[in-house]
């Protein structure tokens, strides 16, 4: 009997604890790894918001030694990863805990890679290049969108080259994720919009990815339903913990989908754009999403129709072209409703930047699972549309 190996699908995820207040149990999970000393990774904003103090209190309450590393930029950098790994080694740590958004969590993943391998993080760009297990890793997200807390991705900025690069490996999936919607209560409207759009794009791209399958589709669809149906309300009612929980759950579902199905051209192009101009990742996604959807539609019309129906669009009696336009219009209206109106030109992107951006986008692993095969010229055209 012959089997089509291209149809096989894997699914990796951390141990997930979801619910308000679960962050306070972090010490219980740290103890299961025989922690000698914990490297606690965060950033100045999360530290000021008070969430780090909760983690410190949990560790101190059970007599667990730790040291704190907060030298993390909004887009974590190579030097920050390398300095963090040196700090990890010099302090004699053997467990890593990160509390924060995607930046501290990605930095923590990078620190674990370098600590385990003893080499520069730059050497691990690409897919499945890790050969040594990382130290035990516990992640506590304080934003609802990046899904670094459940994914097998690490995104790091190389400032020398003005680009972001990806490390993709199941070795960077955290051991434990404590997903506590209370930690998102300090997010401002812009950050809520950025991370929410990111999560929505994760779900859309995972559903139409060439790596999609029955293990990821339910997560992607539920993520789209939760985020599309609740993000605008949540931004308008930032203290509503029930809405926060729905968006946090949507982010988690989107993360489980894209971590296993991978992504597409929106993220390949966003990584290039964000690395070049150091822009917020969600803002880049918002600028590009409807243009990439319009470009990709012909390659997966039935799956895009399911997305449209998930957003509540009545597709009965519509042609493919009409469904495509309704979906694009919905995405534009949605991003406007959460506060994204500006063109890329207002953020410093010019037509002369497009060849550079496109070359790097074509080298991103996410482009490999885009539903429509793309040339550099295709990517250049799409980059030009939101200017």
For each of these PLM feature ranges, what is it?
Residues 1-33:
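N-terminal amphipathic/basic leader segments beginning at the initiator methionine
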Residues 351-387:
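Short, amphipathic C-terminal "tail helix"
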